[in-house]
């Protein structure tokens, strides 16, 4: 493929003169940017950050930007950023329609993760890019294909004598078995064109290999079988190259875990800590050699396996696109990788680009770090039934944190607290018992606690832990430094016995005030709290210093606002004279708290700046836009703990602190901050507590005459039994102060009640547990609103497609609501008014309400903070709810007048938000939906009606393939209700073949299907044989599964569980909730004929749902 870049001569000239004109790609006025879609395991918020930076870079050059991304929660889909936004599936099919309509001059493929890259390759192979003369900016398609196709990649690296693990590309199971014999077991299997190691794994023998190869080939057309190098060190380099060959390495990183754990699931440190100078330069030179040979133009990530005790190495893989690692590298160094890569894509060379952080140097430099960065992944595996907790070559984490310190211990302990606020820092856990050696040997999401247990409590030596875990001794000796401080603290008998020297040394190694207090209390008969430790250290003058990340290790003057705190310093790098407004970000992405709260935080900062306020953001998530260098006046990459927030609040002498836009984490420390003198903006934290505490909340609802399901506060199992028998099962048990329904459960009988009560009490022992009547079959409604001094300014009413009982974060939301009368809307607004008044709300709040029957409305929850649906309602209605909330915080003349967007405005469009699940990644997990949240992200689409918007939205979820007739559909689940029959009766009329696994279901379906030509076939279901199941799905061409079981499986032997799980494993659409199953069946009936006609046509026919956001809305909002 010929280059679209005009010059090929290398140059090192810096931009100096006014009249110098860079040689840019010619004829590019409009650029199509491909987003990554809904957040999933392996592809998360890092692409919101990189895509947002890319759009900013393009707009600086006056390019018209067209974005396709159905992830409505992201910052990049804010309407102040791209010129045009399409909330449509990121698939070759839909991108072709957009190209047909928009005729862009160029396309950016490397900012949308694996999804975007795969789309680009498919569009090139099908000839679409050539047909419409769309230029690919940045790395050429040929290079992308070479880096993704394992055979081509191996051959390219052989050309330049770069060693890679011996490997064979295979397209069948037999080929894979033969390859494994040739490279000798153990082997690793990798999928080509797959994300986050999806479809990869280790095999120790032929039977394991057969199973793994079959599964991997169902996810990708080609797999690579290679010798396993488990136990070697894993090291990564981020490299940038421009069109004329200038190359720099921006960051190198070292994994704490040896090879065998996917880098996304490994703790990572930057810069590398255990490499010799020779090893460092050997790998750096190889990275530059690789990127030049492959012809990368932009940013690239190179992953190595390095022999622990020698100079032997292998290249594991090259990502010729922006990745999770590049987001981390960008935040770790302060070097704006995505921005620079986008500029390089336009044709700029590195010496022509100013460094936007320092403002005084050019981008053609390698950052130098005078600090250490620690990244730790966040797993949420405990939310899933039957999930396999081991971690390996396929990624399972849902988010990550980044901590900065002046030494390993400081960064490591900070990061551990960030990833789980219930941890004190580096600590042990008694959960392993006599399985401790096994816990050290096998990587799981809990292994770091096993290391803590071994070193702190079980007196294991570094040698023994190293032998079992293969983790480098350097890291373990550093952990021992923390252990030694623990030992010293254990001998302290009282607060007055704690010396300044010990306190200072503990703080320098990353100990928190609370950690110090708890450690002393455990071994002395004291009851010291963290506030007393804080008071003592302040009296002794032990206060953290604020340091600046300047990318240049303080060698050049820098103007960065990118800050962290440390006890390993002697002076501050900044002056504290701005009294900025503090905004607390969302912290780590996890199930229940994701990119939507980052959108809220970013929009809060933007509105504050628009109002002339100085802004200070605290957040520690490297995947976010809120931690980008140009979003706020000052950014602290720091913990969201009481201790750290108060440190920064006091140092900065902040005007106030906003705690209600970052989800549950900031909310949890609000009361403590307020009680200790922090000016909390908006609703009084005492009032927030009255909503978070279930008992207080329910009592106030009773007092203001707002209906709710019957409830009772639990003090004993006996009382609970009495209440349940009074209101009749099912009942809902819920603890206070939780996010995403953690430990919430629906209980159907007395036996379940006893088991669940223990669990609920364990979740938040400091707060009461409340039990309420669970109303089956009711409709659920979300109300998002903003109030000022108890008066509602603006509100949105979204209805759930699913019945109550599915967590609101896993529900499909429809806005404007399609099935609510004006009377119901008026009643909902009345409830919102009463609640806002009773809690004296100023700022955002969200309520979940159930509609039981025609007119009965009952409130089930109220959160006095922004909810995860705030970006959705803001973008669908064209009114920025966060902007209004911030104006309410500030008060005065800028507070807008109240407006009713639900009754006084008519809409000729509908938007539907649907959840994005990541069950494919979570081996064994039951994809059954309930009151505890399971989705990792969301997507939304617009349409003229509910059918059109849901049809587009469901196709926007990752790897969703619409089943085309006459393929087969497998039915299973509960036959005591009508739903399954209603779904079957619809799909039978469209020409699908209908299958089931037992006589009862067959008879039931036959009774419901009225179509004369349709027949129900019974198939033998080999439930315990994965290979035969796969063959069965292929033989009967099963392309969708409707399994409407009414409750979770009680064992992994349950046929419904096996049906659900295998639909996920074989990448087949699964519908297991009655209302969404019915809605999808109606979509198929309405849309499938049109889809088939479009797919069979030789011309490009654009379906009616392909319209941009502003075409639906009718105006360009905020």
Swiss-Prot record:
Biological function: Large subunit of the arginine-specific carbamoyl phosphate synthase (CPSase). CPSase catalyzes the formation of carbamoyl phosphate from the ammonia moiety of glutamine, hydrogencarbonate, and phosphate donated by ATP, constituting the first step of 2 biosynthetic pathways, one leading to arginine and/or urea and the other to pyrimidine nucleotides.
Keywords of this entry: Amino-acid biosynthesis, Arginine biosynthesis, ATP-binding, Cytoplasm, Ligase, Manganese, Metal-binding, Nucleotide-binding, Repeat
Domain MGS-like span(s) in chain numbering: 960-1118
Family: Belongs to the CarB family.
Gene Ontology MF terms in the entry: ATP binding; carbamoyl-phosphate synthase (ammonia) activity; carbamoyl-phosphate synthase (glutamine-hydrolyzing) activity; metal ion binding
Region (Oligomerization domain): 421-573
Residues given in the record as Mg(2+) 1 binding sites: 303, 317
Entry-linked Pfam families: CPSase_L_D2, CPSase_L_D3, MGS
Note: In S.cerevisiae, this enzyme is synthesized by two pathway-specific (arginine and pyrimidine) genes under separate control. One is linked to the arginine pathway and is designated CPSase A (CPA1-CPA2); it is repressed by arginine. A second one, CPSase P, is part of a multifunctional protein (URA3) encoding 3 enzymatic activities of the pyrimidine pathway (GATase, CPSase, and ATCase); it is feedback inhibited and repressed by pyrimidines. Present with 18000 molecules/cell in log phase SD medium.
Name used for this protein in its record: Carbamoyl phosphate synthase arginine-specific large chain
UniProt cofactor(s): Mg(2+); Mn(2+)
Gene that encodes the chain: CPA2
Positions of Mn(2+) 1 binding: 303, 317
Effect seen on changing residue 810 to A/E/N: Abolishes ammonia-dependent ATPase activity
UniProt-listed Enzyme Commission number(s): 6.3.4.16, 6.3.5.5
Catalytic activity: hydrogencarbonate + L-glutamine + 2 ATP + H2O = carbamoyl phosphate + L-glutamate + 2 ADP + phosphate + 2 H(+)
Binding site for ATP 1: 150, 190, 196-197, 227, 229, 234, 260-262, 303, 317
Domain remark in the UniProt entry: The large subunit is composed of 2 ATP-grasp domains that are involved in binding the 2 ATP molecules needed for carbamoyl phosphate synthesis. The N-terminal ATP-grasp domain (referred to as the carboxyphosphate synthetic component) catalyzes the ATP-dependent phosphorylation of hydrogencarbonate to carboxyphosphate and the subsequent nucleophilic attack by ammonia to form a carbamate intermediate.
Pathway: Amino-acid biosynthesis; L-arginine biosynthesis; carbamoyl phosphate from bicarbonate: step 1/1
Binding site for Mn(2+) 2: 317, 319
Principal subcellular localisation of the protein: cytoplasm
Residues at which Mn(2+) 3 binds: 848, 861
């Amino acid at each position: 493929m010929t280059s679209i870049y005009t010059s090929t001569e290398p140059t090192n000239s810096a931009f100096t003169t006014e009249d110098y004109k860079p040689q840019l790609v010619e004829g590019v006025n409009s650029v199509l940017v491909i987003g990554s879609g809904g957040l999933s395991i392996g592809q998360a918020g890092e692409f919101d950050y990189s895509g947002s930076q890319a759009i900013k870079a393009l707009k600086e050059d006056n390019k018209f930007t067209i974005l396709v991304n159905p992830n409505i929660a992201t910052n990049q889909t804010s309407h102040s950023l791209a010129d045009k936004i399409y909330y449509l599936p990121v698939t070759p099919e839909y991108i072709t329609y957009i190209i047909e309509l928009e005729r862009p001059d160029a396309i950016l493929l490397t900012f949308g993760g694996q999804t975007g890259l795969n789309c680009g390759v498919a569009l090139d192979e099908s000839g679409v890019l050539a047909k419409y003369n769309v230029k690919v900016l940045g790395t050429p398609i040929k290079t992308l294909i070479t880096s993704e196709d394992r055979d081509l990649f191996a051959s390219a690296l052989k050309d330049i004598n770069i060693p890679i693990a011996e490997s064979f590309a295979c397209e069948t199971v037999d080929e894979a078995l033969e390859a494994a014999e040739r490279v000798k077991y153990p082997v690793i299997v990798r999928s080509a064109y797959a994300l986050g190691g999806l479809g990869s794994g280790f095999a120790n023998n032929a039977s394991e290999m057969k199973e793994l190869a079959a599964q991997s080939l169902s996810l990708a057309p080609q797999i690579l079988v290679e010798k396993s190098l488990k136990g070697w060190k894993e090291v990564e380099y981020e490299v940038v190259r421009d069109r004329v060959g200038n190359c720099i390495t921006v960051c190198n990183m070292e994994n704490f875990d040896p090879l065998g754990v996917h880098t996304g699931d490994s703790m990572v440190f930057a810069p590398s800590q255990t490499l010799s100078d020779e090893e460092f330069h050997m790998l750096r030179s190889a990275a530059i050699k690789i990127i030049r040979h492959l012809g990368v133009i932009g940013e690239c990530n190179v992953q190595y396996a390095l022999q622990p005790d020698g100079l032997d190495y292998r290249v594991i893989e090259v990502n010729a696109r922006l990745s999770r690692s590049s987001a981390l590298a960008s935040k770790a160094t302060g070097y704006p990788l995505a921005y620079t890569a986008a500029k390089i894509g336009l044709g700029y060379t590195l010496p022509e680009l100013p460094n936007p952080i320092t403002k005084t140097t050019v981008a053609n430099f390698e950052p130098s770090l005078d600090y250490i960065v620690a990244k730790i992944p966040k797993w949420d595996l405990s939310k899933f039934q039957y999930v396999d907790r081991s971690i390996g070559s396929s990624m399972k984490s849902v988010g990550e944190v980044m901590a900065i310190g002046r030494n390993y211990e400081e960064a490591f302990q900070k990061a551990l607290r960030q990833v789980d606020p219930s941890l004190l820092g580096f600590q042990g856990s008694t959960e392993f018992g006599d399985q401790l050696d096994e816990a050290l040997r096998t990587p799981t999401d809990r292994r770091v606690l096993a290391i803590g247990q071994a070193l702190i409590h079980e007196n294991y030596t570094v040698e023994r832990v190293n032998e079992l875990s293969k983790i480098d001794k350097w890291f373990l000796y550093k952990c021992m430094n923390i252990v030694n401080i623990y030992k010293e603290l254990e001998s302290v008998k009282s607060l007055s016995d704690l010396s300044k020297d010990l306190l200072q040394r503990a703080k320098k190694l990353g100990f928190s005030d609370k950690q110090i207090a708890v450690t002393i209390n455990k071994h002395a008969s004291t009851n010291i709290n963290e506030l007393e430790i804080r008071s003592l250290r302040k009296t002794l003058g032990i206060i953290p210093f604020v340091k600046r990340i300047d990318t240049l290790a303080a060698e050049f003057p820098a103007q960065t606002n990118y800050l962290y705190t440390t006890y390993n310093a002697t002076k501050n790098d900044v002056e504290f004279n701005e009294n900025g407004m503090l905004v607390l970000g969302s912290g780590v992405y996890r199930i229940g708290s994701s990119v939507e709260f980052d959108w809220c935080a970013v929009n809060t900062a933007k509105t504050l700046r628009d109002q002339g306020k100085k802004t200070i953001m605290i957040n520690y998530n490297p995947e976010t836009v809120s931690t980008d260098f140009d979003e706020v006046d000052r950014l602290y990459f720091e913990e969201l703990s009481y201790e750290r927030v108060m440190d920064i609040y006091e140092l900065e002498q902040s005007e106030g602190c906003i705690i209600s836009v970052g989800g549950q984490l900031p909310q949890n420390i609000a009361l403590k901050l307020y009680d200790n003198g922090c000016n909390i903006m908006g609703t009084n934290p005492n009032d927030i507590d009255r909503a978070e505490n279930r008992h207080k909340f329910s009592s106030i609802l009773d007092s203001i005459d707002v209906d709710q399901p019957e409830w009772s506060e639990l003090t004993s199992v006996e009382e609970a039994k009495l209440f349940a028998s009074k209101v009749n099962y099912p009942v809902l048990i819920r603890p206070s102060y939780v996010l995403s329904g953690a430990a919430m459960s629906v209980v159907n009988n007395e036996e379940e009640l006893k088991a669940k009560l223990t669990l609920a009490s364990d979740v938040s022992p400091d707060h009461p547990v409340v039990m309420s009547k669970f109303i089956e079959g009711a409709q659920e409604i979300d109300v998002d609103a903003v109030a000022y001094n108890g008066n509602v300014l603006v509100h949105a009413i979204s209805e759930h497609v699913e019945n109550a009982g599915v967590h609101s974060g896993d529900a499909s939301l429809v806005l404007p609501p399609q099935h609510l009368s004006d009377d119901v809307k008026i009643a909902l607004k009345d409830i919102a008014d009463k609640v806002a008044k009773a809690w004296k709300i100023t700022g955002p709040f969200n309520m979940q309400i159930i509609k039981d029957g025609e007119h009965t409305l009952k409130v089930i929850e109220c959160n006095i903070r922004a909810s995860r649906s705030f970006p959705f309602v803001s973008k669908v209605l064209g009114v920025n709810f966060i902007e209004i909330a911030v104006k309410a915080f500030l008060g005065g003349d800028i507070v807008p007048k109240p407006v009713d967007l639900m009754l006084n405005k008519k809409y000729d469009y509908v938007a539907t938000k649907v959840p994005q699940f990541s069950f494919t990644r979570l081996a064994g997990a039951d994809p059954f939906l309930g009151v505890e949240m399971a989705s990792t992200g969301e997507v939304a689409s617009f349409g003229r009606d509910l059918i059109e918007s849901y049809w587009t939205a469901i196709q926007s979820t990752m790897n969703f393939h619409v089943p085309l007739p006459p393929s087969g559909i497998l039915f299973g689940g509960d036959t005591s209700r009508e739903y399954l029959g209603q779904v079957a009766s619809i799909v039978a009329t469209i020409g699908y073949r209908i299958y089931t696994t037992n006589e009862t279901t067959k008879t039931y379906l036959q009774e419901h299907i009225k179509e004369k030509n349709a027949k129900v076939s019974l198939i033998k279901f080999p439930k315990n044989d994965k290979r035969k199941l796969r063959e069965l799905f292929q033989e009967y061409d099963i392309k969708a599964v409707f399994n409407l079981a009414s409750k979770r499986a009680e064992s992994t032997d349950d046929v419904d569980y096996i049906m659900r799980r295998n639909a996920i494993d074989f990448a087949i659409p699964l519908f297991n909730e009655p209302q969404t199953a019915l809605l999808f069946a109606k979509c198929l009936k309405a849309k499938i004929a049109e889809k088939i006609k479009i797919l069979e046509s030789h011309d490009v026919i654009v379906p009616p749902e392909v319209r941009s956001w502003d075409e639906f809305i009718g105006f360009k909002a905020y």
